[in-house]
Regions:
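Active-site loop architecture of trypsin-fold serine endopeptidases
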Residues: 31-33, 37-38, 46-50, 54, ...
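Extracytoplasmic/secreted envelope proteins and their assembly/folding machinery
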Residues: 59-66, 70-71, 89-94, 98, ...
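Short beta-strand segments of a lipoyl-like beta-sandwich/carrier module
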Residues: 182, 213, 237, 252, ...
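C-terminal recognition in membrane/secretory proteostasis and scaffolding
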Residues: 1-40, 117, 124, 160, ...
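Short, glycine-anchored, charge-dense loop/turn motifs used at functional sites
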Residues: 74, 131-133, 258-260, 354, ...
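Conserved active-site neighborhood of the chymotrypsin/trypsin-like protease fold
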Residues: 118-122, 127-209, 359, 365-369, ...
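Glycine-biased strand-turn-strand hairpin within the trypsin-fold
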Residues: 30-134, 142-144, 155, 178, ...
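Short, surface-exposed secondary-structure boundary micro-motifs
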Residues: 78-79, 139, 196, 202-203, ...
Length: 509
């Protein structure tokens, strides 16, 4: 079963998912840690310049852009509750077979669980409005129980996490202040390969660092959001730059020489974890759409074509597909439709298996990154013109995008199910498991979403939930029934993978 699933996974891409192969050495770079590496600083030879370049004009542009950008880029400190990394063997014995010390074991367990609030990491963020909205990366804020924002003038604030989107690695924070310096979004569709850009952030603890480079490529899919993040339907169409980017730059600004925001720095390609030539930024148009959704609806609105597909530009995938399905597809450009998901808008619009998508609206589709960007910036109910090739002939059809449940209207947080609101699903424990470990109730957490309420209190996949608000739960329906109309603080009693029992809470969204 596993081998069959593994073979099919590269081709069974439902909706719009980046299908690029993962580039070796790709890493997020949001969290700083002290290290003992020596730093070497060199000075360029006098009167050295690039041949044929008006260095004075470019330098003036850099200065203006830096003066605009630096005050609007902040440091974000991520604080998390730290607990003992492992439970002792006695803890496991106490939990499953009772406490032989008459309560002393339980007291010892509580002492080990006592959290220490301390900074876990640091990243960057960009102020995008004078009233304190800040955009950053999802991985910069993930797991935080407190977020501190430090401005370039060293003034500090405790931030509210407004929302996150692991599928694009974007988060939105808010601090209570007025009259803040901020950056305007540029139209990232209009950037050109080769144009000058500045990366501004707080790498390696060096606040307000500005580096320069060019746009090295556009529409780059690198496979990092699905492999290192918790994205279920990742959208990867990164701006690639050779501006120096290092740990701590995550969530910082990539700007043009006018000081306008063209991207949010997110990842680097490196074998060491430090700058080796290339960084990747989420395009401003996509980032802006995500934060607008979060502000307006409380959640991100995602439209889907509803196709299973193959990236014809990927030599490895095409070769594997041909071998497995005895086909003779040729490597080229475009997206080959291999099938359809449930409630597919593309299928209802007349697209068929074997069609090759070549354009969405006026956007040329050469690979998955192009398709994910063109659809990922849309909402359910939006219509797109899809150009395709069938049996050598070109056709066009209008597709109404749908959400993953087949709906064509936008939803707010109030429309979400209980499991969507708290960010997890649940499977029942088997009776054999309950009997073996002496449990009267319990469900197993699965598909815990990054940044969700369940994730914030430390629950991950495969943790056992025993009670919700003091009530035993044995199924997902039990959880939903307990919280369906509930407003207020939720108390969750759960067991981690070392057998330690916790009771933690969150406010029902």
């Amino acid at each position: 079963m596993k081998s069959t699933l593994k073979k099919l996974l590269p081709f069974a891409v439902v909706g719009v998912i980046s299908g690029a192969t993962t580039v070796g050495g790709l890493q997020y770079f949001g969290h700083n840690s002290s290290n003992g590496d020596q730093s070497y600083f060199t000075t360029a030879a006098p009167n050295t310049s690039f041949a044929g370049m008006n260095t004075g004009a470019v330098g003036d542009d850099f200065v203006k852009a830096a003066k605009t950008t630096v005050p609007a880029v902040v440091t974000i400190k991520n604080y998390q509750s730290r607990t003992a990394s492992r439970a002792s063997e006695q803890d496991l014995f106490d939990f499953f077979f009772g406490d032989p010390f008459g309560g002393r074991g339980q007291q010892r367990q509580k002492q080990q669980q006592a959290p220490e609030n301390m900074p876990s990491g640091m990243g960057s963020g960009v102020i995008i409005s004078p009233d304190g909205y800040i955009i950053s990366n999802n991985h910069v804020v993930a797991g935080a129980n407190k977020l501190e924002v430090v401005l370039s003038n060293k003034k500090s604030y405790i931030a509210t996490l407004v929302g996150t989107d692991p599928n694009t690695d974007i988060s939105l924070l808010k601090i209570e202040e007025k009259g803040l310096p901020y950056l305007n979004f540029a139209n990232s569709d209009n950037i050109d390969v080769g144009q000058w850009v500045l990366a501004v952030g707080n790498p390696l603890g060096l606040n307000s660092t500005v580096t320069a480079g060019i746009v090295s490529a556009k529409g780059r899919g690198i496979g990092i959001l699905g492999s290192q993040g918790k994205a279920t339907n990742p959208i990867e169409s990164f701006i690639q730059t050779d501006a120096a980017i290092n740990p701590g730059n995550s969530g910082g600004a990539l700007v043009n020489t006018n000081g306008e925001l063209i991207g949010i720095n997110s990842a680097i390609q490196s074998t060491t974890g430090y700058y080796q030539g290339y960084g990747f930024a989420v395009p401003a148009n996509l980032a802006r759409k995500i934060v607008e959704d979060i502000k307006k609806f409380g959640i991100v609105q995602r439209g889907f074509l509803g196709v299973q597909s193959l990236d014809l530009s990927n030599d490895q995938l095409v070769t594997s597909y041909n071998k497995q399905f005895k086909t003779t597809l040729k490597v080229g450009s475009g997206i080959y439709i291999t099938g359809f998901g449930e409630n597919s808008g593309a299928e209802d619009a007349g697209l068929k298996k074997g069609d090759v998508i070549t354009k969405v609206d006026n956007y040329d589709i050469t690979d998955f990154a192009d398709l994910s960007m063109s659809i990922g910036s849309k909402r359910p109910g939006d219509k797109v013109q899809v150009t395709y090739v069938r049996n050598g002939k070109e056709g066009t059809t209008s597709v109404t995008l749908r959400d993953q449940k087949g709906g064509t209207s936008t939803r707010t947080k109030a429309d979400l199910s209980v499991t969507e609101k708290i960010g997890a699903e649940f499977d029942p424990l088997t009776e054999r498991f309950k009997t073996e470990y002496g449990l009267n109730s319990g469900v197993v957490a699965k598909n815990v979403s990054e940044g969700s309420e369940m994730a914030k209190i430390g629950i991950v996949d495969n943790y056992i939930i025993i009670e919700v608000n003091g009530k035993p739960v044995n199924s997902q329906k039990d959880v939903e029934k307990t919280l369906e109309k509930y407003q207020g603080n939720v108390q969750v009693k759960f067991v981690d993978d070392y057998g330690r029992i916790y009771t933690k809470g969150f406010k029902m969204p």
